[in-house]
Structure formats: C-alpha cells, structure tokens
Amino acid sequence: MSTSVQRMSRSYHCINMSATPQAGHLNPAQQQTHQQHKRKCRDLGRRLIPARLLLGVIVAISLLSPALALHSPPDKNFSGDNRKPAFKNCAGYAPKVKEEQPENTYVLTVEAVDPDPDQVIRYSIVQSPFERPKFFINPSTGVIFTTHTFDRDEPIHEKFVFVTVQATDNGLPPLDDVCTFNVTIEDINDNAPAFNKARYDESMSENAQPDAVVMTISASDFDDGNNSLVEYEILRERDFQYFKIDKESGIIYLKRPIDKRPGQSYAIIVRAYNVVPDPPQDAQIEVRIRVVESSIKPPSFVNPIDTPIYLKENLKNFTHPIATLRAVSNMPDKPEVIFELNTGRTEQTNSKNTFVFNQIGNEVTISLGKTLDYEAITDYTLTMIVRNTHELGTEHQIKIQVEDVNDNIPYYTEVKSGTILENEPPGTPVMQVRAFDMDGTSANNIVSFELADNREYFTIDPNTGNITALTTFDREERDFYNVKVIASDNSPSSLFDNGEPNRGHQVFRISIGDKNDHKPHFQQDKYLAERLLEDANTNTEVIEVKAEDEDNASQILYSIESGNVGDAFKIGLKTGKITVNQKLDYETITEYELKVRAFDGIYDDYTTVVIKIEDVNDNPPVFKQDYSVTILEETTYDDCILTVEAYDPDIKDRNADQHIVYSIHQNDGNRWTIDNSGCLRLVKTLDRDPPNGHKNWQVLIKANDEDGVGTTVSTVKEVTVTLKDINDNAPFLINEMPVYWQENRNPGHVVQLQANDYDDTPGAGNFTFGIDSEATPDIKTKFSMDGDYLHANVQFDREAQKEYFIPIRISDSGVPRQSAVSILHLVIGDVNDNAMSEGSSRIFIYNYKGEAPETDIGRVFVDDLDDWDLEDKYFEWKDLPHDQFRLNPSTGMITMLVHTAEGEYDLSFVVTEDSMFVPRHSVDAYVTVVVRELPEEAVDKSGSIRFINVTKEEFISVPRDFQSPDALSLKDRLQLSLAKLFNTSVSNVDVFTVLQNENHTLDVRFSAHGSPYYAPEKLNGIVAQNQQRLENELDLQMLMVNIDECLIEKFKCEESCTNELHKSSVPYMIYSNTTSFVGVNAFVQAQCVCEAPLMRRCLNGGSPRYGENDVCDCIDGFTGPHCELVSVAFYGSGYAFYEPIAACNNTKISLEITPQIDQGLIMYLGPLNFNPLLAISDFLALELDNGYPVLTVDYGSGAIRIRHQHIKMVADRTYQLDIILQRTSIEMTVDNCRLSTCQTLGAPIGPNEFLNVNAPLQLGGTPVDLEQLGRQLNWTHVPNQKGFFGCIRNLTINEQTYNLGMPSVFRNIDSGCQQSVAVAFSFGIDRNFIIAIIVCLALLLIILLAVVVQKKQKNGWHEKDIDDIRETIINYEDEGGGERDTDYDLNVLRTQPFYEEKLYKDPHALQGNMRDPNDIPDIADFLGDKKENCDRDVGATTVDDVRHYAYEGDGNSDGSLSSLASCTDDGDLNFDYLSNFGPRFRKLADMYGEEPSDTDSNVDDDQGWRI
C-alpha cells in the first residue's frame, strides 16, 4: 500500500481547467514523463496536479455536474481503500451550557477525521423519531448550537443532556462513526427566593426580654449551588427597631423591651436575598408579631431531632414512621396542641407532599407520602409547626438526606448499526456502542460492556464500547451479523434481589460493506432515439441509458463526453435519462451522435446514443417586401389594388408551392378582401376626410402556412393605403353659436359668416353664402345675405320671438361643386321694455340629516316678459324678514340658514323695477318653501334610475302646456307612480336627487318606506320589473335601473370594479322660474377594487359583545357572524331578492343546499328585463338538472354551461357548492372536494372577462320570463324556469355572509327552513294494493252504519246542541215553548249590505290593488284607504239607520223567563268565546275573558263558539 502511494506521489496529470466548447468537460492530457509533462503543461497553459489528488477532483467534479465528468479512468495504481471516519477526542467532550440561554447558543465543535484522502465528512445528530430536537449541528463544520432554552430548576430539572453525533464520509459505500457525550446545564441565578409560608403571624410574650428568640423565617431558592444561598434582613420600615435577624439562619430576636399591651402587634418587613448578587434576586414578606400575656406561653418540642435522617431512595414503606416528635402546650389548663407539616415552595421543602404526618394526641409521626428519587432530589428540609390553643406556635426543622441505590438499568443511545468493509484485516474498528446509567453516584453508574454472542468474529472494549473485528469478512459469504451487547453497572442491583448488577441488553446489526471491484457495463452498445420534434420543450425526456454493476455499493454516474453540440442535451447524473437542454433546430442540425460514459468511481464504460430530430412547422411565413399603395378616396376598384407574396422558411425550395393562405386581420367594417394569390381588393370605398376618414389607411394582412389547415404558423404584415383627395365634402359654418342681435335695433349687418371644408383640393376654401331656398317666408323676409354678412332687414321684438334658426346654404368652388345647408342660431337680445306683475313660485328642499349649511335655494319670481332685467330690479321683504331665510336685495336669491327646521314656509316679498323704458313700479311676490329632512338611511337604501333625453329643469318643472292647478312635474309624477308601485302613500316616497351628467343623461335617486326603509334591491328590482309601465306613464326612456358605473366592462376599470355611493351635506340646486328644487348631492363612483361591504353592525336583534366590536351576541337561531339568519326554504314556486354583487377579478360563491326534488333553479343573477338601450346580457344561473348541479355563466360575449356529472344530489341530504369566477376560468366544486371528479372547470366564451350585473341576486327561482328574455338577449343557453324545492344555507360571496332569512322581495319562502317539507311520491298499483283499498272502504262503511244506528238510539235530551239561530230553525227548544217564540222574525235584524258583490270586469284592476306579500303594512295608509272607500261608496246605507237589538215574535209583548234573560243587561258579559278566535284575538281574550286565552279547548263551555 505504501508503495502504491509512493508511485502515485511521483505521477502527475495535466488538467485543462477550461471546458472545451464542444465536449463541455475537463480533458486530461496524455500521461508523459514528469519533466516532459511539466513542460507541455506550461506550454499549453494548463495546471499540473498530482495523481493522488486526481481521484478526489474527478469524484468532486462528477458529483457537481455530469457534463464536467472526466472520461478517462483514474490512475491504475489507485487501491480503492475505503476506511471509516473517527472522532478525534470523543472522550474529552464535556461541554457546558448555561440555562435560560436563547436558541442558537454555541455548545461545542466536534471533529472527525477520515484516513482516506479527499473525503468529505458530514455531521448529524442521532435522535429518536419523535424526540424534539434540542441541538443543531452544522453538517459541514461540526459546530453545535442549541435549538431549545433549557431550565435546570424545578419543575423541569434539565441538569444534563446526552447528545449523540454521527460523522459520515462520502465513500462508496459511506461509512460513519458516532460519539456520545454529556452536555451539562449550568445553573444561573434566575429565581428569587420563595418564603416557605404565604404569611407569618406569630405571638410573643409581653415579658419577653431582649435577645429572646421570637420566631424563625425560612426561604428557599430553586437555583443550585451558591445561587441558592439565601440571607435575610429586616427593612427599615414600620417596627424594625424592636427586632433583629440572623442573616444566615433567619432567626428573629427581640432587640429592645416590649412597649405594647397584650392584644397589640408589631409589623416588620423581612427581605430574603441571594448571596450571589448577579443578577440580584430577592423577595419580601410582611411579618406580624402579636403581644400576648406573660402567662400565655408557646408550646415546645420535648424530643427535637437535630441530626439528619438518612433514607434510601428505594424506600417503599409508606406506613413506617420516619420520625416521631412530641410537644407540650406549656399551658397547664389547656394541654392540647396541633401539629402542622409546612409545605414550602420547592420540592426540597415538601411542596409536593413527599412526606406526610399523623398526629395522635400530643405526638406526631412523619412518614413517606411519595417515592423518593435521588437523581431528582437529594435532600429535604421539613418544617414541623406545633400550636397551642392560644395560636402560639413553635417550629422545628428536620433534615432528611436521600441515599442513592442502584435502581437504574443502563440504556443505549440511538445508534443501532455499524458497517465494516469486506476483506478488511483483523483489528479493524467496526463501531462504538454507548450506554449510560442514570444513577446519581459513581458507585452505581459506571458502565462496562461485553458481548453475548459472535465472540469469534468480534471483540468489544469493556470500558469504551469499541467493537473491533477478529477476522476478515467476505460479503458474498455473509452480508450482516446481529451482535448482542450487554452493558452492566458496577454494584449489586436494588431492583433484583440476586446480588448481580443491573444489565442492559441490545442487539446491533453490523453490515459487511461491499468494495468496488467490478467494472460497470451498458446494456446496449448503441441507443437510438428517433422522431424527436425540434420544438420539444426543455427537460423533455429523450431516452434513458442504463449501465449495470455487480458491486452493490457502487454508485454509477453518467455523463455526455462528446457529440453534444451546443449543449443541446443533458443527462441525469444518477439516472441516465437524457433530456432536452437547449432549443433544437431542424434547419441547423438534423441528427446528434452522443458518446455517453458510465463511471462508478474507479471503472467506466461507454456507449453511443443517436438522436434524430424531426421537423415541425415552427417558422412563420415571411413576406418578401414592405407594401404600400396610393388610390383615390371614395372610388371603387374592380381589380387588385395590391398583390402581396410570402414564403415558408420550412420549405427549402422557394420555387415550390409555399402553401400560403392570406386573410385580413382585424377587418373593421369589412372594407377589404384578399385571395390566396395575395390579391388585395377594396370592398367599400374609403374616406380621406374628417371626421371619420383618414389620409392613410392601415391593412393588416395575415399569412398562414400549411394551407391554413391544422397547426399552422402565421405572420401579419402591415400594408399602407394612401388616399388622394377629391372634392367630396360640402362646407359648413364654424361661427361660434349662438349669435346675439339686440331687440329694437335698426336693420344692419348681424355677423360675418365663416365656413370650413374638410377637403384639401384647390377651391375648397372659396365659399359663397345665401339664405336657403327652403327657408320659411318669415326668415326670408327678416334676413338676407350681403356677401358673407348676414343682414337683419327689420327690427326685432324679443317678447314676440326669442331666437331664430336660419338655414344658410354654403357652396365651395371645387370640382365638382359641393354645397350644403348649415343652421345659424340667432338669439334676440333682451331690453327691459315690459313692466312686471305679481308672481308666485314654489321651492322644495331636502335637508340631508338636517345638516345643510347656508344654502342658496332659488330666486324670487315675478311675472315679467323680459328675461335679462335682473339688474333693474330690487328685492325686499314685504313684512319683517324671516329668521330662517336671508334675501339678497340685488339678485333676489333666497338663502336658507343653518338649522332651518322641517316644515312649510310662506315668504312674501316686494320687487321694485326701474329702467329706461319702464317707469318705476313695485309688485308683490310670494314664495312657498317646503323643507323636508331626509335621514341617512333613506340615502343609503335608495334606488336609482338613469333617464335620457330630459334635462334637470324639464324634470322638476311643470310644462308650459299644463299650467293648471293640478298639473304635476315629471318628478312629482314619478313620485306618484312609485307610491302606487310600492303600495305606499306618496308621503312615504322621496325623490331627493336629480343630477345632470355630462353625457346628457339624468340620474335620479329615490327611497320609499313603510316602517323601515325598503332595501335598495327591492326598490330597483320592482322598478326594473315594471320599467315599461313607468316609461309609458312618464313618457320618458330609462337607460338604466340601479345606476352602476361598473356595468359596462372596462369602461371605468380594467379589472375589479365596485360602486361606492358618495353623499354630501351640501345641497344641489336646480332653478326654474316657478319651481326650484334643492336635493341631496348623492352619486355613485366606480372604485377599481373588489371589496365586499363591511358588515359592522349586528342584525336581527343581536348586540355587539363588550370590548369586541366585530363579535355579536345573537338570539337563538341567528347563527351568522353578524346574527344573520343563514337559511331559507323554497317550495318550487317562490323566489327571494338579495343585494347584487360587484364585478371582481376573483369572485367566490359558496352555499349549501338540501334539495327535495332533482330539478329547479337555485340561483339567478342577471337582468330582470330587456332594455334595448343598454342590452347587457351577462348572467349567472345555478340549477339542478336530474340531480346534478349545472352552472351557466355568460360574461356578455357567450354562455358557457358547466355540468357536474360525478355527485348526484339526492333528497334530504345537504351538499356544499363552491363557485369561483375568474377572468379566464370558471370552477364549480361539490362538497369541498379537491379531487378532479369533484371539480368541474370551464372557460368564459369570448373576450369579456367579468360578470357585470346590476340586478338583485335571486335565489329559489325568479319572476322573470327567462325564455323570452333569452330570445331578446340572444342567450345560447337559457336556464330552467322551474323553481327550486328545498333549503339553501350559508351563502357567502367573497366572504360576505348573506342574511338569507330576511330577503327584500320574496314569494313562497320559509325563513330559517323551519317548516317541514312534504314531498309527493308515486306508488305503483298492483293487485294487492287494490285489495287493501277495498278492505279499507268496507271497514269505513261498517263504521259509518254503526254510528248512524247508535245516533238513532240516543235520548232526545242530548240533542240540545243542534239548536241553530239561522232563519230556518231546525229545533228551537227554550223555556218559552208555549209562547210565540218560534215566530221570531230574523229579517228585522238584517241590515242593508255595505258592499254589493260585484264582478271585476278588469282582472288587472284587481291585481293592481293587491298588496305585494313582501310589503310591510302601514296602518295609517290602510285605515285611510278604508275610510276613503266608505266615503265614496254610493251603495252604503245612510248614516242614521235603525238597528234592532232585541225583538221577539211579531210585536208580541208577552214575556217569559227566557225572554227576560235574553234581553237583560244587568249582568256582566261573558267574553270567554274570544279565546277560541285564535292567537290574533289573544290579547282581547286576556283583557275581557275569565279564563286564560291559551286554553287548549273550550268545547265544553256554555258559549264555546266553534270557528
């Protein structure tokens, strides 16, 4: 072996440290003589490396990358020895760590060495699988740190920890060594002393003399050693001057004579502190000392024990007395005493009652209460206290020493196996076993080792546990040995009564390692991989090569040696799998021939891998040149305006057919067409001029290869078409409009006309003007043209006509000549030449939350034909100024002051006018101001409508054509229509916002209420359902119900979009002559976020939990996070409306359903009607179809239908459905299952990416005719119209829980799913079923006959209950039978009916009067309507009519006892029958009845009415 090493030391290898471009690996130079080799390396610029280090280099590089592996075998003199590492100083490792240190505290650095050169050793800590790690070792450096904070003190007792470290080399096979050592946990002063009593209350005789012992204070410390030493002092507080204390023993002495009488007491503060001051730890306690009479003496112990008591730790006799003490009370008249064994704060002071006592008379015995353990506690200090009847006490301390016994069996560390290589000589170390004995003294814990078997193969050192080999092993003969080791301690066992030491047994597996002495070889000499596509992805597997080696320990490493041009491929270092590494190109290389090497660390083998590349269509067509053309605008061409040509780079022959097809990319307006020859034709004429034309038009021509069939590749080429201008545009006016001309002005030039022409041709700028021949005679009379000037022929009177629209014909001078008519808007300026007259106006104000600031609300109006005369008027109050309003005398503007109360105000003014043409005069003006306070809830719960083709002034004003007293503005008409629609009074409806938008639309917000305000989804939902009706009543068009700035996709936001309602206390004013409106400035803005509404309040009677704002305490049954009622049931014909959802990037809908039938619409989110002005077709529908959930989603560009087909939903079982809507995917999951069978995926159709819906979310069904709506909106999939039958629970959308039990609009629902669900089943009818029915019918017939016969036999006295008070009396029996009672005429008691029975000819009229079941009843409206109906009823009786209350016979004056009784009014009336009227009359029954209203039955009562 030494010779081999010497040979290696004289052998050198020249290494090229830079990889060659083709091979990509290190290439060793050819071995030569030392000097020649050295010189050659210097010439080549390479580095000389000794051969003995070459193997390490080869192995290290091979492990790093297969591409860097050497392709030549190592030096032939390499012996291949593999020896195990060994720790240098394992026995000397004795690290210490202080307790309470943080994690990552340094412990120790271990080091192991390996005799083999260039070995890399990795370190690890050996521990059991479920053991919590307390240390971490750096695998490379061997540095050990803590991962745990240790506590040496009670109750943890972490005084030491055994650590086993394993060192493993990187040989083949890897060998290891272990080292076990003890880490001592050192104590620190981290515990303050703890007094052995919670309080000290002692007594002292009144004649006690100075230096007399008063009492003893005792404190313990959990710490160890000097850290546990405690000293005492009396703080200079209270009565400290009377006492002194021994700082070591804690004995308190009297310092000066007592000056207090019996019954009084002294108080001092005693401090116990550690002797070790770093860090300082102390504790304080108050001590009270009562002064007692001199005749009262404390008890004393008769036989105190002053020497320690020694106990073996294995003592198990719990009845035997350990110590006996006797005491006397020192009170002859009261000899009784009471003993107490103090339980201190530590285990050493009996905190866990390790010792107990038993008192018999004045004697006490102490015995064992728990087992002892020397390894935990070595000594105890017991404090026995004796007290007499005067509560005077005396203490005595007993010291107990615990003696160690051999009661622990040695145990082994976690290392259970070792390895020795085959053919190693005798004496080779195999492994080291370590065992430990937990006994506390060296007399019991020294461990020695011996082998129980296999002594002919191995030997063990009895002291160190090192196992060495006694022979040479052959792995092929036997590959492992199970060796049993016995660990014995050094004294007789206390566990077994045999005089032998404790022994621990453990079997260790020693494996015989294999040596690498065989060469690997490939299974094939040549591998072939065909048809590898050139567009194969990186890491695509091409082929796998495999080499075999007879040595089990050999790790074969693979590398590519040559042929890998451009690093196109890579090979798995250990797997042999060849994969694509770089992009391939068939046009560059069509075939690779790789040389692959297999290397086992010593020997190698080679094989060839041929990889053939297959061409794919991966190159787009290439156009031969850039293209442009110039043509005339507005001209058609029959032939090609341009021909383009492209070729396919994948086809080598450019003269061959290139199989290119052409098309127009983004053919807007279908203006172009192109054929496969590249001929571009013009389909529609092109315009060059503004506003819609362009000078240059861009055409994108797309070329696809492979004839456009299958997987084709395309490219797009831009073609520029330039247009030549022709004179095809007529000129138009560009004057600023309107043009003003003052009234009463003499004829003259009004304005110089200016025009423009979009054409660029010569002559386009030379224009002629004239009054159009089609103008009215009035225009032609009053106006004329003078060149390019408009001339006024007459004087104008604004009061006769305020403006004119004059048609001007303008012509250019181009060829051909172009002319057109433009309208000139002329306004006649006003001159104050008319006197004013008295006027009146009305101003309506909504004061939002009563917080309106000073607000201009409108001007004082007087009737005046002049418009521009404000500067000639002066305004003043007619009487005294109003304290709630201020008047601007110059402008007539009325300002409402702050805190103006709600109500109607009549204001009177005097307006004075004086101008050049009108003499000074004054008139009265009257303004009615109505102020209405609007709460915040009305705005938050408001509905909204966006109108078109109407201005805000037109909306609030009464049209001039309807200036009658009963005429209404559009705003008032809307308010009236909404009141009818919501079945409430007009006063309960507020139209409080009227805002004009820049796009000439008008936004109106409104609210309505019964008792609370109606939810916005109810308002918007009902209005949307009746949109056509409202449009007809108002003669207006609605662009949108529920104003939603996010409805049009990507109009406001590119991604998520949420509407936010902005509200301002500053009012918004709209002014017209006779009407002004001051409303709330409330509007919706789009926020580009996805946020669910924050639910900060508790619903349904819940209350916030104290100190937790987001937690609610709810009433039973309301289980939502904010007391929502989270369930609702439907019965197949109902529905419920809830708030809509926002358009989000990621919308998650989760709900639970319990179906009863297998068909029905569960959820619908989409439009409620068809609006041709804004045909948004987005919708979502979730339905059951034959028990399977089906989800249909349309983002507005096509519907996708997702059908789950794995889990069929059956009746009475609850299922969870999760829906995730994303921009590019739609997912539906059943029962929160993540398997592919439980998930159903789909992708949106078309370019749209969001669900944009502003209608309410509908559950259980919908009132919308989905079939008709689907036809109008061109839906490709129409949801099922049939309603859902079952229960829906726990609906959350984007983590917002819905209050399902409280919908805003509903029909046929069961909130909370409380009612039982009845389901119909069909039974088959067979012969047995028919027989059973016949038998049942026969039994019923027999029972009926028996009842009839029995009734015939009943006594007549029992037939009194069949009396009837109807007109045809069946049997009238009363005491006046001989009188003419049977002649009682019931017709006199009949009154004329209040209402006649009338058939409604118009079924819609009846339907219109029906209250919606969701409406909250308004009792005031109800009574008012009923009163109005009674007042208007022409068929009602007169107010004064005769009512007969007591009448018998035909004027008979005879009486009887019965008749007297029936007419008397002297007795109390009996109202017990009220309880039978049901729960609605329960209060009346409780007020007037004698019996409780909740009586189960009144059938036996005298006047029990049966309803």
Swiss-Prot record:
According to its UniProt record, how is this protein modified after translation?
Answer: N-glycosylation is important for biosynthesis and function.
**GO terms for biological process, alphabetical:** apical protein localization; asymmetric cell division; axonogenesis; border follicle cell migration; brain development; branch fusion, open tracheal system; calcium-dependent cell-cell adhesion via plasma membrane cell adhesion molecules; cell adhesion
**Residues in Laminin G-like domain copies:** 1125-1313
Disruption-associated phenotype: RNAi-mediated knockdown in segment A8 of the male genital disk causes loss of the normal dextral rotation of the genital plate and results in a phenotype with no rotation. During oocyte border cell migration, RNAi-mediated knockdown in either the border cells (BC) or in the surrounding nurse cells results in various BC migration defects such as BC deviating from their migration path or failing to sustain the directed, posterior movement. RNAi-mediated knockdown in the outer migratory BC disrupts distribution of Rac1 in the BC cluster but does not affect motility and cells remain clustered.
Glycosylation, residue list:
317, 466, 552, 766, 949, 983, 999, 1073, 1145, 1274, 1290
Region (Disordered) residue ranges read 1488-1507
Signal peptide as annotated in the record = 1-69
Instruction: Alphabetically list the UniProt keywords.
Output: Calcium, Cell adhesion, Cell membrane, Cleavage on pair of basic residues, Disulfide bond, EGF-like domain, Glycoprotein, Membrane, Metal-binding, Phosphoprotein, Repeat, Signal, Transmembrane, Transmembrane helix
Identify one Pfam family in the record: CADH_Y-type_LIR
UniProt xrefs under InterPro entries: Cadherin, Cadherin-like_dom, Cadherin-like_sf, Cadherin_CS, Cadherin_Y-type_LIR, Catenin-bd_sf, ConA-like_dom_sf, EGF-like_dom
The subcellular localization recorded is:
Cell membrane; Apical cell membrane
Q: List the disulfide bonds.
A: 1098-1112, 1114-1123, 1287-1313
Q: Which residue ranges does the entry give as Cytoplasmic-facing topology?
A: 1350-1507
- According to the UniProt entry, which residues carry Phosphoserine? 1493
Q: Propeptide-annotated positions?
A: 70-261
Residue intervals of the EGF-like domain: 1084-1123
The membrane topology of this protein is: Single-pass type I membrane protein
Q: Where are the transmembrane segments?
A: 1329-1349
Q: Region Interaction with Inx2: which residues?
A: 1350-1507
Which PANTHER family does the entry link to?
CADHERIN DOMAIN-CONTAINING PROTEIN, CADHERIN-23
Assembly and partners are described as: Interacts (via cytoplasmic region) with Inx2 (via cytoplasmic loop). Interacts with Hakai. Interacts with Myo31DF.
Query: What note about domains is in the entry?
Result: Three calcium ions are usually bound at the interface of each cadherin domain and rigidify the connections, imparting a strong curvature to the full-length ectodomain.
Identify this protein by name.
DE-cadherin
Originating organism: Drosophila melanogaster
Gene that this polypeptide is encoded by: shg
